[in-house]
Amino acid sequence: MVFKNKLFFSSKKSGSSSPDSSNSPRSVGSNSPIRSDKKKSKSASKDEPPIPIPGFVGVGCKQTQIKDGLKKKDGSSKGKQLSSEVQAHSIGKSNLSPSSEVKKPPPPEVKEGPAFVSPIMASSLGLNRIKTRSGPLPQERVFNYRNDPATSNLSKMGADGGDLGSGSATSGSGSGNRKKEAGSSKLGLEENMDRTRPSDNKSDRDSLSPDTGPPRSLSPTLPPSGSRLQNVASSSGTGRSEMSSGRSGPLRNSDFCTPENSYEWENPKESESPRYQALLRMTSAPRKRFPGDIKSFSHELNSKGVRPFPLWKPRRSNNVEEVLNLIRAKFEKAKEEVNSDLAVFAADLVGVLEKNAESHPEWEETFEDLLILARSCAMTTPGDFWLQCEGIVQDLDDRRQELPPGVLKQLHTRMLFILTRCTRLLQFHKESWGEEEQVVQLRQSRVLHSIEKIPPSGAGRSYSAAKVPSTKKAYSQEQHGLDWKEDAVVRSVPPLAPPENYAIKESESPANIDRMSSWKKLPSPALKTVKEAPASEEQNDSKVEPPNIVGSRQGRDDAAVAILNFPPAKDSHEHSSKHRHNISWGYWGEQPLISEESSIMCRICEEEVPTTHVEDHSRVCTLADKYDQKGLSVDERLMAVAGTLDKIAETFRHKDSLAAAESPDGMKVSNSHLTEESDVLSPRLSDWSRKGSEDMLDCFPEADNSIFMDDLRGLPLMSCRTRFGPKSDQGMTTSSASSMTPRSPIPTPRPDPIEQILGGKGTFHDQDDIPQMSELADIAKCAADAIPGDDQSIPFLLSCLEDLRVVIDRRKFDALTVETFGTRIEKLIREKYVHMCELMDDEKVDLLSTVIDEDAPLEDDVVRSLRTSPVHPRDRTSIDDFEIIKPISRGAFGRVFLAKKRTTGDLFAIKVLKKADMIRKNAVESILAERDILINVRNPFVVRFFYSFTCRDNLYLVMEYLNGGDLYSLLRNLGCLEEDIVRVYIAEVVLALEYLHSEGVVHRDLKPDNLLIAHDGHIKLTDFGLSKVGLINSTDDLAGPAVSGTSLLDEEESRLAASEEQLERRKKRSAVGTPDYLAPEILLGTGHGATADWWSVGIILFELIVGIPPFNAEHPQQIFDNILNRKIPWPHVPEEMSAEAHDIIDRFLTEDPHQRLGARGAAEVKQHIFFKDINWDTLARQKAAFVPASESAIDTSYFRSRYSWNTSDEQFFPSGEVPDYSDADSMTNSSGCSSNHHEEGEAEECEGHAEFESGIPVDYSFSNFSFKNLSQLASINYDLLSKGWKDEPQQIPHHK
């Protein structure tokens, strides 16, 4: 099975995309070629002797060279040449014709697979003296590394002898041909390279594949004595029967299968010398090969040629490398043009300077700077200029803008025009292909590190033997002796070889004699915010410059560099685990620098994901995780996953058909077609999400509504190019941790989640994995059909697991649909397997009803917990997943602690609530309402919510940690605030209330304690339903629900029937809060609406300016009286308060709710003159007046709790989880209303227990409380991705 898996993996590696999308493994040493083999062999036999296409020789020699060679060798006439060219043209057409994909019989002479692909017959070209061979000569590198830089790159590609470059290198065809070759300069060679025909484009595209097979030099064996190679000199001129399956026309399998070093173009006789022939014979002995290396790659010929160039972007690695190398070749050509223009520009500069030397002597310094810059740019290598050009252009443009209009500014503009020829091309590369370049490198590195001692075929290396590592030159080195990257040496060492063995091999290697001191590739510049680039002229122009063989060589060498840059997957995971205790200033666990490590831990599945796939993986992981949140049985979840996979595959197929029918580049699909998919896709999955009365809890709002998609689209400055369409921050606002959240409301009704997630702009990377998706769905269905108790079920599940692993190993992309869903299916099958084993041991176990009891204390909860959270204990979030660091604040019956997720290192604020208190104080509905609101609201001025879960005694709400404290703590430290600062804070509260009211939510407990300050200094509302106001502690005395907390607009409130005795009790309990901020209608219980929040805004505005609330008094009864009688101690106007502030506060504190400011909506509040200087559209993006400056990520010094801590807080945690309160003294600041909080707290606890024991129902269930907010967890992925490129991680100390 291991051997079989290697074949599957090798198939996955292959960048081929044969027409039938076959990914099935091929047996070792198989002699039967596939379709494209048949196609090529037949086309070769039908088209007579394959005369090479003249454009194909553009890589290393001119078209006239071939014609001259043919004339001098055979004396053929022009007519014959014309006929040959017509034949060659027909060969090129047949290669591009989709109709030739079938009906081609295999050649009978292929015996050894791709390693023994025979060369094209020299006699068929009329060049009988050319020596050809099928294996590379690693020893030649000793002689050829010192070649002149102008040496042909075609030979360095390792073409078997059928390449005209090789033929010319070994040809002794007369002085005329050699003169032409010797006379070709570096520039001439490069120009010729750029003149290749479109027909060459296809050949080069095939040769660019990084995964097209093991290097031919792995076993540079010659065929047996009966092979054609040894009889090449006497072979017939036609060569019809001798064309191998991999040789049709100019397309030769060896072109990309043999990365061979260069021949001597300038000295063709060397290849015919006795020493050369001796070396050839010495290196021709057969060598043992690895079984996994025997694989036919002939099917990859013409696999892309049937498509026109604009359809190149199915994002398979070989296609990507083709385009990347094309861009690099164009960049080099553009650089040469820039050099030429800069020379002319410098001459003009000197002329202008001479004319104006006397009249404008002050220009001399500027002219000199321009001359120096022009010379520096001209002397810079293309590789260095690739990195530097953007910065140069930016600096030059900055200097230009500082100049007054005139000659100097015109000269700067002219130079900018010259240089931007390169920067425009670079920008196109970054916008369109920057991410794919990293995908190719990352995928290759992962593949290479997963197979031991299998040399990577796409890395551009040549393993003649284990002891002969070699260094390849990039295209620029071969042409111009240029270097692409600083201080990087690529050595051909097997990825898993130990360093000491490698050192020995390296010292023994003769190729080490000529090792380059630095191996420099075309680097990938730092990526910026990108938009979905439209198809550019380079893509749509049918005359686009084709990629050349030399460029493909350089692209494969790029992949080799990636091996050194990326650690194996295991090592990467271990490396990341070392940093899990570190925290960045975004307060998400520190990740290694993304540009170096190229992976982060997904916050949904907590698996390592390549950064280039984070976007797609987050969407896939959201879908895969959805049904684990519902407490469904194992079989139900397996069927749900299978249905999701079927829908994904169907969506992809539908998009592909639309793209083929209507899109010129196969990628652009209109939104109208995407929305039409909802009529095609099955609705059963969305039906599952709406069972029973838990629509609000289990409807998966983060995937079911467009807000989740808006979040994915709205994240700015993404370092990886996204496929959600153009990036824009219009309508978006910045919140903490540099996240972006929309202002859009929660849409109803909710569409199908899969249609929303997959129906967005763009597509996943892994559309080519559709067959594997279907296979995964079939496996999941089969596993779900396994009958518990059947003797054959357990072996059947084991076979399902084996098949599942095979399918996963055949995936083409890591961390996307196949791997993510495959992992979930594997987990579910294993879970079912364990249950079946338990059934065999204990017949009393019921598989369909066995779940983990989350609440445990009551027997009824066992039944209710069927719908709780995932069955598997690893998937159920609990307090054990968090490390409690320190307390933050205390509320009426809840505590807030700073905690760290153990697996990721992310910091969170966990609100801990006692179930007994919730029940005793009649606040169960309130806490459930708070959780539901936090799940659904998404606004930059509302705190973000991530998890909710329970244990035996407590409820837990996990929210983002905001280190800036709250406005109450700020007031305690500063006394009062400047009116300008207050204006901004209140404006942000207005925006938050506008959003909440539009969603039908009334906060009802606004006060400075509930206005938190985020990392960026902006305000965030919290505490939806769990108020710290003292009245809520007396709800056990009320006939109705709590008078304080969050409600919906249409919720009717009970009247407040408070007696004098109850008011006295409130006095005693004043330690837990006061009713300062409550509106009169709430105090009176006469019914209230959204205007109650505007009353609270007026109170807060007054307190921020003055320092104390307007109705403050020693006892709650006096506060109550002040509120009802509107006794406000107004400060002096305008000395202590502006007239505008006085007016808006007065209108906010209007007793009649219908006359109160805000009764007609937030619009009239925003139009008040007090906010005349506020820009509401950009408020969230403006810099705050106060930005927290914490000493560390776990610094909680900004929080000053209104309430004291006591020993009863230890009851909030299971044994062993009691936090250390040694540093809680800084938070135990009490309000002025209390005398002895500790005693009163103890009295309250005692009283509470007494009340709990007398009449409170004890069977209340919190089984529906658990929730995992997938969309917010996905937003952490984007926070990490966007911040990882620009923020240095900060390390936090461990809390002892």
UniProtKB/Swiss-Prot annotation:
EC nos: 2.7.11.1
Q: Where is the composition biased (Low complexity)?
A: 10-32, 214-249
Q: What keyword terms does UniProt attach to this protein? A: ATP-binding, Growth regulation, Kinase, Metal-binding, Nucleotide-binding, Phosphoprotein, Serine/threonine-protein kinase, Transferase, Zinc, Zinc-finger
Biased region (Polar residues) positions are 730-740, 1225-1235
Which residues are ATP-binding? 888-896, 911
- List GO BP terms, alphabetically: protein autophosphorylation
- Disordered: region residues: 1-274, 457-480, 524-553, 724-750, 1214-1245
Question: One Pfam family, short name please?
Answer: Pkinase
Question: Modified residue Phosphoserine is at which positions?
Answer: 32, 1070
- Which residues fall in a compositionally biased region of kind Basic and acidic residues? 68-77, 101-112, 178-208, 1236-1245
Annotated TM spans: none
Q: Which family does it belong to?
A: Belongs to the protein kinase superfamily. AGC Ser/Thr protein kinase family.
What is the protein name given in its UniProt record? Probable serine/threonine protein kinase IREH1
Q: Give the organism, scientific name.
A: Arabidopsis thaliana (Mouse-ear cress)
Task: Show the taxonomic lineage.
Answer: Eukaryota, Viridiplantae, Streptophyta, Embryophyta, Tracheophyta
